[in-house]
């Protein structure tokens, strides 16, 4: 693995790491070894708004799966996400972000409230405190109305690109 990508992982914000961890954990729920299979990897990356081609995905897998196990742990996954973010200089498309917003907006009212955010984060099986959830909400809720609208979500996601 390139040291440059490992160094870039260190530059990720806690919010970015939490978002990546939440997505990763959804697919690792049944795995005893804490790793996801390479075939699940594309699904996780698409969930996070990345859209690697099968060739790009295989290239990234070959790069991080040094032992040939066919699985990727969270640290390897972070390196892959940094690489994909770097390669995807345009960031997430409007359509991908819209899909992600709808995934969080369970009741389809056009807002992500604290409860919806909590449900999505707890679905990962990861231990996350109320304070962590409230901090994420505060970071995303720029007008302090207690919920994240689509424009706030887009602004928040710019920091993830």
Swiss-Prot record:
Entry's Gene Ontology BP terms: cardiac muscle contraction; regulation of muscle filament sliding speed; skeletal muscle contraction; transition between fast and slow fiber; ventricular cardiac muscle tissue morphogenesis
Swiss-Prot/TrEMBL keywords: Acetylation, Calcium, Metal-binding, Muscle protein, Phosphoprotein, Repeat
Organism: Sus scrofa
A Pfam family assignment: EF-hand_8
Amino acids binding Ca(2+) 1: 65, 67, 69, 71, 76
SMART domains: EFh (SM00054)
UniProt name for this protein: Troponin C, slow skeletal and cardiac muscles
GO molecular-function terms, A-Z: actin filament binding; calcium ion binding; calcium-dependent protein binding; protein homodimerization activity; troponin I binding; troponin T binding
InterPro entries given in the database record: CALM/Myosin/TropC-like, EF-hand-dom_pair, EF_Hand_1_Ca_BS, EF_hand_dom
Disulfides per UniProt: none
Gene: TNNC1
Binding site for Ca(2+) 2: 105, 107, 109, 111, 116
Residues reported in the UniProt entry to bind Ca(2+) 3: 141, 143, 145, 147, 152
């Amino acid at each position: 693995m390139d040291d440059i990508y490992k160094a870039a992982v260190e530059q990720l914000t806690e919010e970015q790491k939490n978002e990546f961890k939440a997505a990763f954990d959804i697919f690792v729920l049944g795995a005893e070894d804490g790793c996801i299979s390479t075939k699940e990897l594309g699904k996780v990356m698409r969930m996070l708004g990345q859209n690697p081609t099968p060739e790009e995905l295989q290239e990234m897998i070959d790069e991080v799966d040094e032992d040939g196990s066919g699985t990727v742990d969270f640290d390897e996954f972070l390196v892959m996400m940094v690489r994909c973010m770097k390669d995807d200089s345009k960031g997430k498309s409007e359509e991908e972000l819209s899909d992600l917003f709808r995934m969080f907006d369970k009741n389809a009212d056009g807002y992500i409230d604290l409860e919806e955010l909590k449900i999505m984060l707890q679905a990962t099986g990861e231990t996350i405190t109320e304070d962590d959830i409230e901090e994420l909400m505060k970071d995303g809720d720029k007008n302090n109305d207690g919920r994240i609208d689509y424009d706030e979500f887009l602004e928040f996601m710019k920091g993830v690109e």
